[in-house]
Amino acid sequence: MTAAPTQFDRRAFLRRAALALPGAMISPHLADAVAPGPRPVTDLRYIARAMPLRRRHEWTRIQPVPERLRVATRNRYSQITLHHIGYDIVTAKTEEEVVRVLDGVLGGHLRRNFGDIGYHFLIDYTGRVWEGRSLAYWGAHVSGHNERNLGIVLLGNFERQRPSAAQLDAMVKLTHLVRHQYRIPQGSIYGHIDLGQTLCPGRYLYPKVQRLNQLA
């Protein structure tokens, strides 16, 4: 999928703005980042074979700021945390509409010195999965709990709206796939609320997240 030139102009601006931010403003959990060089590409064929997946290069040309990322030790993950984006109701269905939402999330995270979008995967209203931050890097989605923590966000505000059936189905499939890929122990799937002072992932999603730990 190719974005319109105006989108890429805007993305280029965000990239330049992120690079211009002073190092003193980098979040503590990203300050020790050591990820120079090209962004590693992880093999996600095990996901693409099972469900709709859009790779990162399909929705944005903005590259991460590697100096602000932390390389995942041997790509090992021991837990999964589920989120909602929280700030607005989202029912975007077309890929173009979803890309605009993803642009907003990415731009916000760059302005916060995350070095890239903080989540590893994003699930839209139709159940499509979008690759966010490479799994080669620890995420930036739960303050103080990002190491070995794989981050998945569902687009929407689930204090104010209910997740779609397609989103919930995709959440179940995706968590199952990554849990088995990384041998994440049963009982190690959390809502953001379990790890921090927040309502995320919202009252309409959190009970569904809790049930994930009961699945094989």
Which residue stretches match the model-derived regions?
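Active-site acidic/histidine clusters and adjacent loop/turn architecture
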Residues: N75-L110
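Cell-envelope/glycan interface and biosynthesis
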Residues: L102-L106, L110, D116-S134, N149-G151
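Basic/polar, cationic surfaces and motifs that engage anionic cell-wall
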Residues: T2-I85, Y125-A216
